[in-house]
């Protein structure tokens, strides 16, 4: 008989097998983008300072940005948050509201010591398959390095969105399917 715990365990084994298969055939990093020299390292105090540079204002589960240039700072699985998730302004997978025509500077930080992640922007909304095929509009970060030696990986990119609804998604197999995504409304 399956209990909720055994079903969850079996599901994660399936996701893990899918990720291993994807990596074996070269899909894991190809789906998330390439690991490149744009990734830098930061210590925990540096990460905390970066998180403070987000220019949004929180209201409920929404972070609203204003102005011609906005700075979104997103982290993967900050301490105290469930795996897998993104955090912006201490909110799990919040909706981001951004003015149309703004220049959006994104800093993405991976603080999850067990996994790499990606932060990609797409028009395709949920639900997402274990092996998501989302055709990113912005293949934002590529595949992040796994943090080690007390240092975390981060990278920056710039986006110039037009009005519409978008989603930020982690393309690592199984992550978006288990909730590692959020909505972006540009208006």
Curated annotation (Swiss-Prot):
Pfam families under this entry? Answer: Copper-bind
Kindly list the places in or outside the cell where this protein is found, as annotated in its UniProt entry: Periplasm
Report the leader peptide range: 1-32
Q: Which UniProt keywords apply?
A: Copper, Electron transport, Metal-binding, Periplasm, Signal, Transport
Cofactor dependency:
Cu cation
Q: What induces it?
A: Expressed during growth on Fe(2+), sulfur and thiosulfate.
Q: Name one GO molecular function term.
A: copper ion binding
Function, in words: Electron carrier from cytochrome c552 to the A-type oxidase.
Q: What is this protein called?
A: Rusticyanin
What species is given as this protein's source? Acidithiobacillus ferridurans
> Which lineage do the record's taxonomy fields give for this organism?
Bacteria, Pseudomonadati, Pseudomonadota, Acidithiobacillia, Acidithiobacillales
């Amino acid at each position: 008989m399956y209990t909720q715990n055994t079903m969850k365990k079996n599901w994660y084994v399936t996701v893990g097998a899918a990720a291993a298969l994807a990596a074996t055939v070269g899909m894991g990093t190809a789906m998330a983008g390439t690991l490149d020299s744009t990734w830098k390292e930061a210590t925990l105090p540096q990460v905390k300072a970066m998180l403070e540079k987000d220019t949004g204002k929180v209201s409920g589960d929404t972070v609203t940005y204003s102005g011609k240039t906005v700075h979104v700072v997103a982290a993967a699985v900050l301490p105290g948050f469930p795996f897998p998730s993104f955090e912006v302004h201490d909110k799990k997978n919040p909706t981001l509201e951004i003015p149309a025509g703004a220049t959006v500077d994104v800093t993405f930080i991976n603080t999850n010591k067990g996994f790499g992640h990606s932060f990609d922007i797409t028009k395709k909304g949920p639900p997402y398959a274990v092996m998501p095929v989302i055709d990113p509009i912005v293949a934002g970060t590529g595949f992040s390095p796994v943090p080690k030696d007390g240092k975390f990986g981060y990278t920056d990119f710039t986006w110039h969105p037009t009005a519409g609804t978008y989603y930020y998604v982690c393309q690592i197999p199984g992550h978006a399917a288990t909730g590692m995504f959020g909505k972006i409304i540009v208006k």
